[in-house]
Design a protein with these regions (language model features):
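N-terminal Lys/Arg-rich, disordered targeting/topogenic segments
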Residues: 1-3
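Hydrophobic membrane-insertion alpha-helices, especially the h-region
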Residues: 6-25
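Ser/Thr/Pro/Gly-rich low-complexity linker/stalk segments immediately outside membranes or between
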Residues: 25-43
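Acidic/histidine-rich, surface-exposed loop or edge segments in extracytoplasmic proteins
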Residues: 37-55, 107
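Auxiliary, metal-adjacent structural segments of Zn-dependent hydrolase domains
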Residues: 53-104, 114
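Active-site recognition of the HExxH zinc-binding catalytic motif
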Residues: 69, 119-135, 150-154
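Short pre-active-site segment immediately N-terminal to the catalytic Zn-binding motif
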Residues: 105-122, 136-145
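Acidic/His/Gly-enriched intrinsically disordered linker/tail segments
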Residues: 120, 138-205, 209-239
Length: 239
């Protein structure tokens, strides 16, 4: 009996360890205080050691990022719980990985110290909004190609690293579109290592040219609504 109980406790401990290792961001968003974060605004948790001035600055930049995304999409339909770290150790603890800003579906935004800026946060918030509008199940089934998702995020964030300056009547292409753009997120990451930043610029260019031909930014939420209803990207996207 005691031996069975010991085995059960061991299995339970291993299971909990696996959950904390693999699903740490999900655990962190469910219990931010368990990871040393505290609430600083509605839906926003920061590392407890973050000074008051730094908290206020982070909140201001987050608000600007939300406004940037809302302006593009015609309003925000999804408000993720946001976890902001002041130290790399905190970001590692909540499962942030190697990114500066990360997200889980449409319900969580993870921000590293170097990710506290408008461009990076609005880029990731675009992913949150896009995934939420299409639906997580549809996203898991590959409803939106990775290049489109990333290209939209670059345009939403107005990232000068990958975009040409805004000019009236002109596109934002800093690099031309490329053939065989990656569709699967894993392929995107693999090609990113090969092509580098050019991949982001090309994806943004391809999306921008499509938007110009289809009425501007409102074409994106209109497309996403149809994808959520079950239509396919290939049937809707006309270069």
């Amino acid at each position: 009996m005691l031996r069975s109980a010991a085995w059960l406790m061991l299995i339970l401990a291993l299971f909990l360890g696996f959950i904390l290792l693999v699903a740490r961001p999900v655990v962190a968003v469910a219990c931010p205080w368990c990871f040393g974060l505290e609430k600083t605004a509605e839906g926003v948790y920061v590392e407890a050691a973050m000074p008051a001035a730094a908290r206020q600055h982070a909140l201001q930049l987050l608000t600007q990022a939300e406004e940037r995304v809302g302006n593009f999409y015609g309003g925000l339909q999804h408000a993720p719980r946001t976890l902001i770290c002041a130290t790399p150790r905190c970001f590692e603890r909540i499962g942030g990985g190697g990114t500066r800003v990360g997200s889980v579906g449409s319900f969580e935004l993870l921000v590293a110290p170097e990710g506290i800026n408008v461009v990076l946060m609005s880029h990731e918030l675009s992913h949150v909004e896009l995934h939420g509008r299409v639906g997580l199940w549809h996203m898991e089934l590959g409803a939106v190609p990775a290049w489109f998702d990333e290209g939209v995020a670059v345009l939403v964030s107005d990232d000068p690293q990958y975009l040409a300056p805004a000019r009236h009547g002109r596109d934002r292409c800093a690099a031309g579109p490329q053939a065989d753009m990656p569709v699967d997120p894993a392929d995107w990451r693999a090609q990113l290592e090969e092509r580098g930043d050019l991949l982001y610029a090309s994806a943004a260019c391809q999306v921008d040219l499509w938007m110009i031909a289809n009425g501007g930014p409102p074409a994106v939420p209109a497309l996403l609504a149809k994808l959520r209803d079950g239509q396919t990207f290939d049937s809707l996207y006309k270069p």
